Amino acid sequence: FLKRDGFSKIPPLNGDEDFGLVAGKDVTQLISLQVYSCVECGRCTEHCPASTTGKVLNPKEIILGMQSYLNESGPASDAPLLTEALVESRDNPPAKYMSMEAAFECTTCGSCEYQCPVGIQHLPIIIGLRRGATNTGAWEDNHGTKLFLALEKHGNALGLSATERDKFIQKQGFPIFDGTQEYCLWLGCMGGYDPKGREIIADFARVMQHLGTTFGVLRKEKCTGDPARRLGNDLVFQTMAEFGLKALEAAKVQKIVSICPHCVRTISNDWREYGIAPEIEHHSEFMARHKDRLPRQNSGESIVYHDPCYLGRYRNVYEEPREIVAMAGELVEAPRSHERSFCCGAGGGLAFLGEETGERVSHVRAAELVGTGAQIVGTACPFCNTMFRDALSSIGDAPPQLLDIAQLTARALPKMQETGEQ
């Protein structure tokens, strides 16, 4: 009964006076009930990608730190919940675990919540702490500042001019959505600006064309605001969400398909605070539904599939991408898969912050995937693809090939004339 409806549901923004979890007075009764329900088993920490790779973050100690704060300062206190002294707190466990350094090491993978036997929702608490630090200006990070400025100025997390997206659309020959097509193909930051993400979009577009599914793209599209939302910047997130909803409404979009689980999650859940977003699905769901009309490659190659956190634990989509992988080759399971999958390290905005402490999460996961002996690593998220691109290149002389499920499917399609550079 402790849980809100849905997995890791962040409470909606509550007016201009809601800055997040800044002090004791911001701690709700539900949060208090949850933190005092902790049985201190440590399963959340045991499965946390940040904690297990040598970071400061310890989900159990975040919960116990909230307990200690409420016991010592009280729920009406104005004292800050998070300590600002990052270096000074390292030798002081209570301060260390409740530091901004710890709060901003979370990848929001949700493994802690999945593992918790009493239903504590760690992520709304951690993101609430981030909101309190970011919205009040207490959190100062060069990477974070650069990200927020990129979103505000350019409308995408990569900080590139919107004309770059326009050029890509023209070279691919993508039609602009005008209300007559069945789907709006959502490019996202990675699909619209990242070279590898563009390859995935191009191949998925080929799949849709092969199926005879009509689609178009928005003339103007900005980031969903996912990294801003997870890092606690309410203003930037709200700006992105309102722009996106107005663009979809103006284009009379009814159905969206996206290659990015983060875009799917944000549009289907977080945007609903500001209006009713159209129906959206992930491209794995789309392809699985049409699998009987897609060619089988039967390459015989072994493919280990990595479950993205925002597709698996957040959306409960596990079998659909596996059905697509099995059509392309021999499916191999990683030691940690499905609900117990290990994060790539990109979520929660961390793809843009860098990783300076401990082992790189992506390298730990990549080594695990390589250890299966599979010839191909299959992904279903452009952020996972980006993280593994770097990680796999650092492992041995002949790393396995890295392909999105759309690319696996497109390999079996009839060859088409190239539409231009990506």
Stretches found by the model and what they are:
Residues 41-44, 48, 112, 116:
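The canonical Cys-X-X-Cys-His
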Residues 54-72, 79-82, 322-328, 337-340:
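Active/binding-pocket-proximal capping segment
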Residues 26-35, 57, 61, 70-266, ...:
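Iron-sulfur-cluster electron-transfer modules
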Residues 1-6, 48-60, 64, 122-126:
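Juxtamembrane/interface segments at transmembrane-helix termini
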Residues 1-8, 297, 304, 323, ...:
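Membrane-interfacial helix-loop segments of redox and metal-homeostasis proteins
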Residues 187-282, 310-422:
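Cofactor-cradling patches in redox/metallo enzymes
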Residues 1, 281, 285-286, 300-314:
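Catalytic cores of enzyme domains
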Residues 1-21, 26-29, 64:
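Membrane-embedded alpha-helical bundles of multi-pass integral membrane proteins
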